[in-house]
Amino acid sequence: MASPWPVWTLSWILILLAVLVPGAAADFNISSLSGLLSPVMTESLLVALPPCHLTGGNATLTVRRANDSKVVRSSFVVPPCRGRRELVSVVDSGSGFTVTRLSAYQVTNLAPGTKYYISYLVTKGASTESSREIPMSTFPRRKAESIGLAMARTGGMVVITVLLSVAMFLLVLGLIIALALGARK
């Protein structure tokens, strides 16, 4: 007869994994960064929308300030997907310009320089799915005087300005001469 140890050991390992893995009950992940866009501003944050399979569901975005019990909830209907859902997606690119679409929810009226925890709860029909709670922080406010103006007036800008000024002078001078010669005939 086989020893019951492997069965007991496996069951205990599974129980420990279920208990110790944080956030194991979350159904989907949300992201805050895309590499193309900084979603953080001084008084607002951009959060990716819930996944496409939740289109049409009622989403509740929960924003909780770190070290505070105050919770702000915002509700909206998950918009339909048009292709892959990314925070920023290229819609059209050609002839020197690129059109992008921003697929994000903007959380507004936040305090500058503060850490927040953000999560979704989406109800679609009889099913309810939730996201993991992700931390995001707003930028602190900076005085306008403290923002560095490196390269405010570069040498290239000065040269271009001088060349354009000389060209405009010559153009106006040529126009005056052409009008004067045309009026004499």
From Swiss-Prot:
Subcellular location as annotated: Cell membrane
Assembly notes: Interacts with uroplakin-1a (UPK1A).
GO CC entries: apical plasma membrane; apical plasma membrane urothelial plaque; endoplasmic reticulum; membrane; plasma membrane; protein-containing complex
Name under which the protein is recorded: Uroplakin-2
Membrane topology reported for the UniProt record: Single-pass type I membrane protein
UniProt signal peptide: 1-26
InterPro entries: Uroplakin-2
Organism: Bos taurus (Bovine)
